[in-house]
């Protein structure tokens, strides 16, 4: 995840760093790996406010990330690098040799078209 830092041309710009989104692929997420995420807005099952000052925010879809990576010794190709609204890391859509797709957390320096493999 590249981070852009600014020169201190004004007082408010001193020490300012932002995430550079230029490396992301501009496309829609894979629908088979997404599902809806219900937001509570600080309310419990009775509808009463249990956490004050918490709103609903923007509507999000949850991307199912494969943390296990249990397809050992099978190469996969990185198809997209996407923004994930539910975490601070970028995610990568990979396609295995048997045409199965999954999301993984994208490490620094990962590019589209790169081959990845998980082994024990």
Predicted regions mapped to residue ranges:
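Short alpha-helix capping/helix-loop boundary micro-motifs
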Residues: 101-105
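Short, acidic/hydrophobic/Gly-rich beta-strand patch recurrent on exposed beta strands
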Residues: 91-96
């Amino acid at each position: 995840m590249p981070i852009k830092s600014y020169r201190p041309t004004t007082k408010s710009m001193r020490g300012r760093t932002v995430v550079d989104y230029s490396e992301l692929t501009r496309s829609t997420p894979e629908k088979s790996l997404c599902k809806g995420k219900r937001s509570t807005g600080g309310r419990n099952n009775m509808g009463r406010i249990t956490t004050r000052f918490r709103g609903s925010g923007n509507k999000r879809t949850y991307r199912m990330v494969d943390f296990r990576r249990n397809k050992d010794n099978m190469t996969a190709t990185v198809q997209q690098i996407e923004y994930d609204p539910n975490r601070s890391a970028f995610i990568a859509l990979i396609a295995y040799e048997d045409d199965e797709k999954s999301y993984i957390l994208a490490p620094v320096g990962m590019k589209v078209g790169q081959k990845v493999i998980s082994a024990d």
